[in-house]
Amino acid sequence: AWKDVSQVNDFSTLVMRGDRIGLVGPNGVGKSTLLKLLLGKLQPQSGNIRTGTKLEVAYFDQSRDVLEEDKSIADNVTDGKDHVVVNGQSRHVIGYLGDFLFPPERARTPVKALSGGERNRVMLAKLFLKPCNLLVMDEPTNDLDIETLELLEERLIDFDGTLLLVSHDRAFIDNVVTQLWVFDGSGHIDEHVGGYSDWHERTGGHKKAQKAEAPGQKSADKKPEAQP
């Protein structure tokens, strides 16, 4: 609960291997809280969470990894190693960074000289080196340029593990998830098969927007559509 408002209430579900789930709803309704509960970073006030065996989790949150400013792109990603292991195969770091749109001559550039979009690509390159079968991403599309957004989308489409994704980007959600957890702002979560467009067509987003109004907030004359 937060300020006497329950963010996740009486939610029971089963996540299967390979599920691709998008968490949608207005800001502050408990999406990040639920992710932290599932990851064991927070403890529930009631109920329990059971996890499967042999879970390997990679977590990308809104704060992002802190990059070492004076180190190069390559050294930030590999801790100074020349080779990385990707899907069981050894690759040279220069070739791997090419997958993230860094030309060879750019790989030795200090992070402090990078643009915001390049920094995001460095963090994604670090993330996808982690062996995982559960990928948890909290607002990964924030501050991404178009090239990096397309790169991330391709990576997630190719990912064959379980995905839990929080994002306000409707098209991105439609392209990478197969089911939704929709937060209504009162602690209740609805489960729906399909992406954001499927849910919106079936239920009408304006209804969810009304439910998601913050406690104590007065209704506006005209209700906006819900934002994921």
Please identify what each model-predicted range represents.
Residues 1-228:
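ABC ATP-binding cassette signature C-motif
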